[in-house]
Amino acid sequence: MILLTLLYLIIFYIIIDFIKKNYKTKNQLPSPLGIALPIIGHLHLLRTDPYKTLAKASKKTEHGILKCWNGEHLMVVVDNPSIIKQMYVNTNNFTDRPQTKVFEIISRNYKNSGFANGEKWKHLRGLYAPSFTKIKSRPHENIILKYVNFEIKSLKNHAITNSIYNPFLIENINSFGTKVITEIIFGREFSENEVYSLIGPMNKLFGILDTPFPSESISFLKPFYRRSYKECDKQCEELFKLVEKVYDDHLLNLDKDNPKDVMDVMIVETDFKEKDHVICICCDLLMGTKDTFNTIVLWFFVLMINYQDVQLKGYQEIIKVLECTGRDHVTIEDIDKLPYIDGIIKEISRIHPAGPLSVPRTAINDIMINGYFIPKGCHVFQNTYGAVYNYMKESDEPCKMKPERWIENEKLRKDGKLDPTNDLALISLPFSSGIRNCPGVGFAEYELFLLFSNIILNFHLSSPNNLKLNESGHFGLTMKPFPFLVDLKLR
């Protein structure tokens, strides 16, 4: 009798869930993925490269916005640049993050700026935003250049002894971004062992998160993923403890009137009362740099190898500028003189955005967008990949690397002739948009500029067999290229 009752309840739940997911209402969003199944929704269609599946589905809609079901969660996916702007820039209804088990673990119960919501997020944003402006930019540039020079020297030594280079190894360029951000945040140069001790738990954490968690979509599966959640928590706690030690060391030598680094600024801003928040924000910055920055660096190597003509044009532009300055390396002062190099950097993130589906947000309240009803609590995704490949003109060949397209885009803007529907700056948004976009995007762009331009200046990059590399990539926490080797040759 008990088993029969349980069976009836399960059948009843399945029927109700099916009706809930497929019931049509007025002003509802289109659902081009078709019928949503009970319990799993459209999860079976989103297992491989979901950003491509959703971009393809979006083409069937009128306005580039759709709904689907990620298990028990209603997803709203948008790739139309004008609607993205309407949602993320023109309203404050999409500044919250979903509260999931993984986000809770990573943020140590929502104590960081990445996953906190509401007034708490605004407060935490107020802690880290001033920290990047109160520390003068010149010391930042000097720190970046110091590590760029270290990296160039290391690459030269490698090219002399063995031209075949593996950019995925921790002892190679894989640790560059972490070295820079640690000195920016903590105010001192970390030893190799200290850097590796920070990278270790982050690599383990990202390795776990690269594998999908169906339990984030279907809550009753959580007990079956207890071990994975526990391992995530272990790695996050290890990173937290390492940063906590740095925090305690800072307290011993802190000058309230002259904060020397980002952590100092945040400690002073919190009046020494929010230790956990400061530590979690620092962990947030470390993790964001480690995975996203490294992914962009890997795609840089892939595209420079596959587009030898682009690499050559970039080199020629640098040489021409340096002949006028008399310097033997590129600095931030050269950024406006190297529009083609700037175009290379923008093309990398346009063609292969590190996060093709940006970090999700939630609707704080019910809202009408472009005539469609978006309910409170739904998960909202910006399909960065879909915005590029659905909204660039086919005649512009969006799949090809053309840095000069950014130069032309800027020229048209200055002349007042730019078509707003074909503005690359609005179509390509690899770091999201609105007040909840990536907080360190400006700093990251300078970092990428100095690193990439000086690599192109000093080395010719190719594949060991002179064949093109695979650009399909592997979708996990970020969109990374498959493993490859680089043939480094000194210029």
From Swiss-Prot:
<keyword id="KW-0472">Membrane</keyword>
<dbReference type="GO" id="GO:0020037">
    <property type="term" value="F:heme binding"/>
</dbReference>
<dbReference type="GO" id="GO:0005506">
    <property type="term" value="F:iron ion binding"/>
</dbReference>
<keyword id="KW-0560">Oxidoreductase</keyword>
<dbReference type="InterPro" id="IPR050182">
    <property type="entry name" value="Cytochrome_P450_fam2"/>
</dbReference>
<dbReference type="InterPro" id="IPR002401">
    <property type="entry name" value="Cyt_P450_E_grp-I"/>
</dbReference>
<dbReference type="GO" id="GO:0004497">
    <property type="term" value="F:monooxygenase activity"/>
</dbReference>
<keyword id="KW-0479">Metal-binding</keyword>
<feature type="transmembrane region" description="Helical">
    <location>
        <begin position="1"/>
        <end position="21"/>
    </location>
</feature>
<keyword id="KW-0408">Iron</keyword>
<dbReference type="Pfam" id="PF00067">
    <property type="entry name" value="p450"/>
</dbReference>
<keyword id="KW-0812">Transmembrane</keyword>
<dbReference type="InterPro" id="IPR017972">
    <property type="entry name" value="Cyt_P450_CS"/>
</dbReference>
<dbReference type="InterPro" id="IPR036396">
    <property type="entry name" value="Cyt_P450_sf"/>
</dbReference>
<dbReference type="GO" id="GO:0016020">
    <property type="term" value="C:membrane"/>
</dbReference>
<feature type="binding site" description="axial binding residue">
    <location>
        <position position="438"/>
    </location>
    <ligand>
        <name>heme</name>
    </ligand>
</feature>
<keyword id="KW-0503">Monooxygenase</keyword>
<comment type="similarity">
    <text>Belongs to the cytochrome P450 family.</text>
</comment>
<protein>
    <recommendedName>
        <fullName>Cytochrome P450 monooxygenase 521A1</fullName>
        <ecNumber>1.14.-.-</ecNumber>
    </recommendedName>
</protein>
<comment type="function">
    <text>Cytochrome P450 monooxygenase; part of the gene cluster that mediates the biosynthesis of the trisnorsesquiterpene discodiene which has a function during later stages of multicellular development, during the transition from fingers to Mexican hats. The terpene synthase tps8 converts its substrate farnesyl diphosphate (FDP) into the bicyclic sesquiterpene alcohol discoidol. The cytochrome P450 monooxygenase cyp521A1 then catalyzes the oxidative degradation of discoidol to form the trisnorsesquiterpene discodiene.</text>
</comment>
<dbReference type="GO" id="GO:0016705">
    <property type="term" value="F:oxidoreductase activity, acting on paired donors, with incorporation or reduction of molecular oxygen"/>
</dbReference>
<keyword id="KW-1133">Transmembrane helix</keyword>
<dbReference type="InterPro" id="IPR001128">
    <property type="entry name" value="Cyt_P450"/>
</dbReference>
<keyword id="KW-0349">Heme</keyword>
<comment type="pathway">
    <text>Sesquiterpene biosynthesis.</text>
</comment>
